[in-house]
């Protein structure tokens, strides 16, 4: 079955205050990394519009998913260990 989510919104504000800026040696690249991380997380949440769960059985064999997708990014799959 698949659960459809009602659109919901989260307002997020991230502030790199002066204390944080000086803590990291006034390195503007550190601030840029924080900005990139926030944009990445925002991108994840924009794409999650539904969630499916398979209670009775796996509809897609897990080995197919791992072989084609996950193993590229997950070292645990490369060594054939459970996630």
Swiss-Prot record:
Pfam families from the UniProt entry: Reprolysin
Q: SUPFAM superfamilies in the record, alphabetically?
A: Metalloproteases ('zincins'), catalytic domain
Q: What is its EC number?
A: 3.4.24.-
Q: Superkingdom of the source?
A: Eukaryota
- Where Ca(2+) binds, per the record, is at 11, 77, 80
The question of whether Glycoprotein is a record keyword is answered with no
Name of the top EC class for this enzyme = hydrolase
Q: Give the chief site where it resides.
A: secreted
On assembly, the entry states: Monomer.
What's the protein here called?
Snake venom metalloproteinase BnP1
- Species the sequence originates in: Bothrops pauloensis
């Amino acid at each position: 079955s698949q659960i459809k989510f009602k659109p919901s919104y989260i307002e997020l504000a991230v502030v790199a205050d002066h204390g944080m800026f000086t803590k990291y040696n006034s390195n503007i690249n550190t601030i840029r990394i924080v900005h990139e991380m926030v944009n990445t997380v925002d991108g994840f949440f924009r794409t999650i519009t539904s969630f499916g769960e398979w209670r009775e059985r796996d509809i897609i064999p897990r080995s197919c998913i791992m072989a084609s997708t996950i193993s590229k990014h997950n070292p645990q799959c490369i060594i054939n260990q459970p996630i």
